[in-house]
């Protein structure tokens, strides 16, 4: 074969067409088999060559990062997990077209990804094709020192110096320490089935290793703390004097030992040696059809014998990836024995000038001893020498290294490369179960990962994933079919495709995230950040920024989706770039929803040539200064928050905002940190807030913590009690959010502005996809459209079909006599499989499922957005509405009454003229917002407020405006979307111009603007008629008012010039009426009339400037002066009551006044003559007959004008007809006429 220099084992092994497993023996695996101690493995199919820039030598992270740097392996704490919702509509043919990949491409596309362990059908497709499907590039086998492997030629056997690379110092391995006593096996650990044949050691004679075929089977060892399904292949290492493998007879059950040297792992289960909090390194499985398997190098499974079809637990094995950036120079020898077995031997080429010193004879890595360590702290601080007794009495000694020496990805890669030097041969007729193939590596690099209170169990086993909870966005379904193409990892059905996509996104990595060497030599002059440039999606950090860019640009597979939020078709080539895009939506309070998912492997020549792959850690936190520690997070202050709904309780308490006025000191509310509800003593203010915000059970006798008075869900019984007392306005006034005790004067202000308690709402989480909705109708609509299945039921028989054509074909073939009948639609509940014949029944049925799904959500007080966490809402407020809040706070008093803009009159609207943010908030939110009142600003502020309101409402619907459905609380940025939604979802016909602030809609934009200005802004630009006495007639246009006055009252509105008014030469009266005249002039000139709720003609008595004619305060006792005054008034065109001196604009008003105030029904003689404006012909005094009663007809020669309302008629008949409209006046006139006769 010759020497070959290759960046990894995959490219190297892909050069040989050796069938590892028959394609007919593809494994069908389901999610129920995807659990392991390290959490269910979530694969990223087809991402075999997704290179992780771990060593980053090629990317510029600095060459030669020491593999023994223990601080590089510290896993980062958790940060919020990004979720992606997939509603796939891809056709199965799209995935079938990918099934014909070549072996080389398949090796790269279907290998272990940096995103996590390979899934069920992904593993099988990557390694089960007729051609050698390689496990991807995770094994860049090169020592960190830059040297290549050196083949050790020893007489008879080749001792495997497996761990010489991993000790803190090479000499530590040879120190003979007392052998550790064998510890008892874990509960349930049984003796694994014996191996049919012994593992073979490399022999020095010849460039390859020829295993003897007739070697007797080696008895399997009973491993310490290993389950019965986790036998492990003995990776024998030692000096030349170690016993030969052929000399080891088979034994039924050797005694249990600590650190069993077998590395064969059960493919069906992960070894329980690794607790759910300890990452487990797992092998890249290669399957062989009924023949001795060839185990590719993996950090934990150097030799994995396999036989037969693999079981379905493959996706629970996370494949560790190597992190060395140096290629491995190896020699491969492939031999097919006479019995049909295939032996593939990988040895290093002697190129390292200073190879590590060989260990003692028979040295092993005692994996079990490593994994026996507790989840958080290792048990051994230094190397230990353990003794293993084999079945024939032979005792082998091995060195067990502490966890600290194997903490980075580079070390794990070296271990994988070292282990790959040996091959295990099994005879064809082995009795080993397919699930016993090299499946579970017992965590060669156990790490103490941070804990999180809100861990979510993924998969059916309910195991906890490390670090933080990852929300499974789709229900797990068993994969229905395998993918059979070399390198093709795409499922053939949409459900399995979406399931595979979810496994990619939620995969767990069992190796720590890479940490670069951030201490470059002084002569380099590099200024590196304290924690490097870190990928928030996988936790890997890099020394240089371009290395992080290369990390995001790597090509592992092609993921093509349609982002529903961006409304664009996007293509991603790795998981980190996809999650980075999803995080951008998450920062805006949205969960990324995508559809039309298509996943394809990337050709080998299109992948970026990065030799290294490092597994991801799915959770990360922003970089923190100082050394990284591994505390148990989520149990106190500073707990890392997660965006998953299931981890809301683990977030740090949200403290009140510092927006309270100085008059209300906040410190007085926290003099004693004792809960007044349950008397629990807290440490400080943050502890008090955490006590009131942590999720807890409801009060005794209550089923939930939902307030029956308002739509609000409280976190626990203490918060609920304080909230209930808030409704009753009873002391003590305890804030349900922070637990502070406030005075009643400051309590409401604190709730509204500091703690934002009023922003809580009741939301509903979809039980299928975990998306939270703000209303019952919206989640019902979501469940019906997204998760419920609709069937077409045959009207004759009980059969139902998913499509109408299928039901029609069934009727045509099975019921020919009923072909004309139509199939009936039936609806299946997505949560309990109940079938309903009517859609409304299904909607009502959802109520019993939604009660347990209630969650607390938070609505932004300035826009309709809903948030699952209060902290996210506060960040949104700070980033989006900060300027508006500052302006509002500047103009806000210490405390004020709440005013709603919808009901305030014109004067109140003017008084809030400077409160521009209040108008903007009320115009952009669909819910009634409470705007604190402010001191009355100057009048000129009125115009900017109105312009701002009109500007905000005239927009096209973008920004914080938009339209919100009042039924389902869905928000739409575009008007057309809102109109279509109302018609489609709720069956309501909405006109083209709907109002953002209420449910009314209009046919034209001017009508909408007028509606908003009058009804919502309180600026009533209307024109009331002064002459109408019946009702309050107002007009929206001055032109319409003038026409009305001309037609109805027979007056010219233009004749009411500013000169109209009292011109008495009396100083006091003139001074009293001067302001009135000026105000009326100003009102007429700016076209702003008083509100029609108060008739302008009847101004308040004593208000000299309220109307056009105030009451005449001067009254004379002599009739002469009265007549003089009356003459002046008549000439001036006004009407005055001679009894009290009040002036009126029309005779009708004067008549009504005299009848109500003075009980006079007759005419007023000359004093009641109709006054005309300047320029009009003056009516003769004889128009009203003082002795003629209430006759509608005027005196001879006068115009035909009604004396009640002053309307002019063209004929006496029309005047009589008109006079009938005055009711009692007409009746009295008839009665008077009869009396005269």
Curated annotation (Swiss-Prot):
One of its GO terms (molecular function) is zinc ion binding. The keyword ATP-binding does not apply. Transmembrane segments: none annotated. One of its GO terms (cellular component) is cytosol. Residues 97-111, 297-310, 915-925 have a biased composition (Low complexity). It is found in: Cytoplasm; Nucleus. The modification Phosphothreonine is found at residues 148, 377, 900. Changing residue 242 to I: In PDB6; uncertain significance. Residues 1-80, 96-330, 880-957, 1051-1121, 1159-1195 are annotated as: Disordered. Residues 234-244 have a biased composition (Polar residues). Keywords: Cytoplasm, DNA-binding, Isopeptide bond, Metal-binding, Methylation, Nucleus, Phosphoprotein, Repeat, Transcription, Transcription regulation, Ubl conjugation, Zinc, Zinc-finger. Widely expressed with highest levels in obvary, muscle, blood and lung. Residues 880-890 have a biased composition (Basic and acidic residues). The keyword Transcription regulation applies. Its main location: cytoplasm. InterPro entries: Zn532-like, Znf-C2H2_11, Znf_C2H2_sf, Znf_C2H2_type. The modification Phosphoserine is found at residues 102, 129, 140, 227, 242, 251, 253, 266, 271, 374, 433, 495, 1057, 1082-1083, 1085, 1106, 1118, 1184, 1191, 1211. It is linked to Paget disease of bone 6: An autosomal dominant form of Paget disease, a disorder of bone remodeling characterized by increased bone turnover affecting one or more sites throughout the skeleton, primarily the axial skeleton. Osteoclastic overactivity followed by compensatory osteoblastic activity leads to a structurally disorganized mosaic of bone (woven bone), which is mechanically weaker, larger, less compact, more vascular, and more susceptible to fracture than normal adult lamellar bone. Interacts with ZMYND8. Belongs to the krueppel C2H2-type zinc-finger protein family. This is Zinc finger protein 687. The gene is ZNF687.
